[in-house]
Amino acid sequence: MLNRFSYSSNAWHNLRVDGPDADGIAVIVLARSQSRNALTLPMLTDMVQLLSAMDADDSVKCIVFTGEGPFFCSGVDLTEGFGEIGKTRDTHRDAGGKLALAIHNCRKPTIAAINGTAVGVGITMTLPMSIRIAAKTAKISFPFVRRGIVADAASSFYLPRLIGYGRALHLFTTGALYPAESGLLHGLFSETVNAASSTLPRALEVARDIAVNASQVGVYLTRDLVYRSPRSPEQAHLLESAALYTRYQSRDFEEGVQSFLEKRKPRFQDTMREQSGEGVLDRGDCVVGLAFKPKL
């Protein structure tokens, strides 16, 4: 495990980090309100580093992202550009995509508290997150075609899976700005709140519920099952069975049952570090974090 340190004491570029608190909740704030929280390459790089550190830190149980001021994020800062372009098509890697993959690969649940307008990578960076909560006043846009480019941050993978191909194509094709409650965005947000000021408090409520009541390892494996499950129910059944086999032998399973029977809050002890050491979360096979592939 990494030695615990104060994330807030590090000189992150236009990011403020609060926590983790006593319940294990860390908050990453996009703190560039004078530029509507537009992202720079150093900010994107720092978030990737933060996610890597928090992923390995057992004291972090849930990560919440939000924006400073009235905006969540207005996308990439176009005055600074998109960073260095690779020497060839095969070597170029989208910086927003690197962040999206860092979020996807982070084993801790992530929540977007979208307190205001989110545009471009400002919204696509939230697609790999576990939960998105938005203010009803927020405006959302995927404006890539209006800038002469294409979707970024692996959003061509995530968005259709979240809201369906028809709505995703409409949003991508028009590049227009839509209110958070638009029918075109149906399914993108698990909750919307009336006031922008209520977005972060509600996200923290959800994060605390997860941190206090859910097994970290159980949450991670379940999310991996959702994203990596095969196409047939039979194959999904085999993978779920393999994952259940490992969890039935865990301390968290014993504690989950015992706390339910005793009508008390669970005190889960399994950590990512311990499970990784046993090979349960070995990503080598790329099959729901299991260290083996069941025979189909």
Curated annotation (Swiss-Prot):
User: Does the keyword Lyase feature in the UniProt annotation?
Assistant: yes
The record's principal subcellular location, in a coarse class, is: other
Query: What if the gene is knocked out?
Result: Abolishes the production of AF-toxins and their precuror 9,10-epoxy-8-hydroxy-9-methyl-decatrienoic acid (EDA); and impairs the pathogenicity. Does not affect growth rate of cultures, sporulation, and spore germination.
Q: Where is this motif: Peroxisomal targeting signal type 1?
A: 294-296
The UniProt entry, under InterPro entries, shows: ClpP/crotonase-like_dom_sf (IPR029045), ECH/Chromodomain_protein (IPR051053), Enoyl-CoA_hydra/iso (IPR001753), Enoyl-CoA_hydra_C (IPR014748)
Q: Which GO terms describe its cellular component?
A: peroxisome
Q: Which UniProt keywords apply?
A: Lyase, Peroxisome, Virulence
Q: Give the source's domain of life in one word.
A: Eukaryota
Q: Which reaction does it catalyse?
A: a (3S)-3-hydroxyacyl-CoA = a (2E)-enoyl-CoA + H2O; a 4-saturated-(3S)-3-hydroxyacyl-CoA = a (3E)-enoyl-CoA + H2O
Q: In which pathway does it act?
A: Mycotoxin biosynthesis
Pfam entry (one): ECH_1
Function per UniProt = Enoyl-CoA hydratase; part of the gene clusters that mediate the biosynthesis of the host-selective toxins (HSTs) AF-toxins responsible for Alternaria black spot of strawberry disease by the strawberry pathotype. AF-toxin I and III are valine derivatives of 2,3-dyhydroxy-isovaleric acid and 2-hydroxy-isovaleric acid respectively, while AF II is an isoleucine derivative of 2-hydroxy-valeric acid. These derivatives are bound to a 9,10-epoxy-8-hydroxy-9-methyl-decatrienoic acid (EDA) moiety.
Query: Could you say which protein family the record assigns here?
Result: Belongs to the enoyl-CoA hydratase/isomerase family.
Q: What else is known?
A: Gene clusters encoding host-selective toxins (HSTs) are localized on conditionally dispensable chromosomes (CDCs), also called supernumerary chromosomes, where they are present in multiple copies. The CDCs are not essential for saprophytic growth but controls host-selective pathogenicity.
This chain's protein is named Enoyl-CoA hydratase AFT3-1
- The protein's organism comes out as Alternaria alternata
- Highest classification ranks of the organism: Eukaryota, Fungi, Dikarya, Ascomycota, Pezizomycotina
What is this protein's gene name? AFT3-1
